[in-house]
């Protein structure tokens, strides 16, 4: 029988004995008190950066903290976040999204936890009234826990063509 691997959440996994030993050993080592001083954290961040082909990575102790940092970096305060209505960000983190990042969630009924490109385009193309907040970010979760761990295809058509920027010069 093939062993079942459940990746919905870290709380449904069972650590192996070597994982427990590694956690116990890590807990016995003294830690730094400053930003990014911990050797284990540095090693984890370097590994993540290498795997992702990035210059650097940053470890967050919780998904909520990582999501809030992403929102604050990518969505202006006062703008909506467009997401599937069942997204973790919409349900579990909805109040922190609005309260901490200043970005309320506009939830749509997606397909198996994912917004379709047509839904995103139709929503973004709707005329907004002056008193309505703009949509500042489209949030796509992968994998989607509430929808049974469904994953979006890596090449899913989620973008739409953007007009080419016009070059302006002082002489024209």
Describe the residue ranges of each PLM region.
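Solvent-exposed alpha-helices and their adjacent loops that cap or buttress functional pockets
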Residues: 49-52, 73-74, 98-100, 128-133, ...
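Short beta-strand segments
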Residues: 61, 83-84, 109, 136-141
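N-terminal amphipathic/basic leader segments beginning at the initiator methionine
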Residues: 1-23
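Glycine-rich loop at the start of a catalytic domain that most often binds anionic cofactors/ligands
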Residues: 69-78, 96
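Active-site phosphate-binding strand-loop segment of PLP-dependent enzymes
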Residues: 7, 115-166, 172
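Active-site-proximal loop->helix
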Residues: 92-104, 168-171
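Conserved N-terminal alpha-helix of the aminotransferase class I/II PLP-enzyme fold
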Residues: 15-63, 85-86, 90-92, 96-98, ...
């Amino acid at each position: 029988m093939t062993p079942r691997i459940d990746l919905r959440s870290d709380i449904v996994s069972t650590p192996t004995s070597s994982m427990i030993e590694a956690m116990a050993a890590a807990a016995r080592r003294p830690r730094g008190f400053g930003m990014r001083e911990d050797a284990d954290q540095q090693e984890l961040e370097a590994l993540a950066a290498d795997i992702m082909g990035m210059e650097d990575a940053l470890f967050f102790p919780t998904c909520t903290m990582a999501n809030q940092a992403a929102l604050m970096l990518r969505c202006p305060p006062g703008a909506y976040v467009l997401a599937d209505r069942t997204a973790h960000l919409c349900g579990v983190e909805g109040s922190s999204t609005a309260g901490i990042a200043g970005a309320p969630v506009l939830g749509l009924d997606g397909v198996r936890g994912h917004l379709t490109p047509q839904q995103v385009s139709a929503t973004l193309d709707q005329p907004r009234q002056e008193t309505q907040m703009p949509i500042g970010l489209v949030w796509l979760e992968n994998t989607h826990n509430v929808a049974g761990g469904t994953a979006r295809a890596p090449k899913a058509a989620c973008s739409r063509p953007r007009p080419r920027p016009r070059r302006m010069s002082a002489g024209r």
